[in-house]
Amino acid sequence: MPNVTLNGVSIAFDDIPPAGPAQRTVLLLHGFASNRNEGWKRTGWYPAFERRGIRTIALDQRGHGESVKSHDPADYGREHMAADALALLDHLGVQRCDVFGYSMGTRTAMQVALDAPDRVSNLMLGGIGGKLFDPRPAGSVEAMADAMSAEDPATIKTEMLKSFRQFADEQGEDRMALAACSAADSPPLERDALGTLTMPVLVVAGRHDDLAGDPEELARVFPRGKSVTLPGCDHFSAIPHGLLKATVFDFLDGMLDDDFPDNYR
């Protein structure tokens, strides 16, 4: 798939048209240590969108996949990644689309919506919730960077950091680029700013997603926010799950109503 130079850096992307006329376009933004293939293609999202007549655009965010691999934290941050996403839409001649981010990609997606609200038809945020607004624990940024740069993964102290490191190793990612990405300085997203976004917003997370928190807490910030909690899912198992796909497509179809009941299996 092609690479294009955007904002002076090389960005890899896929642009997949449906078999017939496109009914709509979606921009996909993957999570930390993932990439467009692992986050969206392998998990079945490409064919799922294609079957529904949706043009699918997905990029490897800076430091990930086949895109630029800077080892300087100054080259990362939410604002840079959002600018890359908007520049890709410009390059492809897309004026307006749906935007779907997962985990780290939700932060990029929200920044895209804040920077260019007129270009986002629907905003979908997965693997995120009320913990977005929690202060970062002291040393957490350094801990993630250290986990990515550690010579011996056995020295990593927490299970969450071990999971991200294992995931990065499985994808063959550049760990020094990921360390720089995790150390980037991005100001917190503010409730008041997010509350100005008037497009429909979906916030969805697994019931066992300890990284996200309650999706309802975040959804309440948006004037047209809706939340869904996925039973039986954690942060990593939610993205390929059929329940997440059903939720996203019901949302796009305007049919999303109630959350899954607590006893859903």
Regions inferred by a protein language model and the residue ranges of each:
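Flexible "cap/lid" loop of the alpha/beta hydrolase fold
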Residues: 107-151
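Active-site loop/oxyanion-hole signature of alpha/beta-hydrolase fold enzymes
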Residues: 41, 48-51, 58-98
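Conserved alpha/beta-hydrolase "nucleophile elbow" surrounding the catalytic nucleophile
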Residues: 30, 97, 101-103
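Catalytic active-site module of serine/aspartate enzymes centered on a nucleophile-bearing elbow/loop
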Residues: 230-265
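Conserved alpha/beta-hydrolase "acid-adjacent" motif
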Residues: 210-215
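Hydrophobic, aromatic-rich cap/lid helix
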Residues: 165-190
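Short beta-strand/loop motif that positions the catalytic acidic residue
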Residues: 197, 203-205
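Conserved HGGG/HGGXW glycine-rich cap/lid loop of the alpha/beta-hydrolase fold
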Residues: 9-68
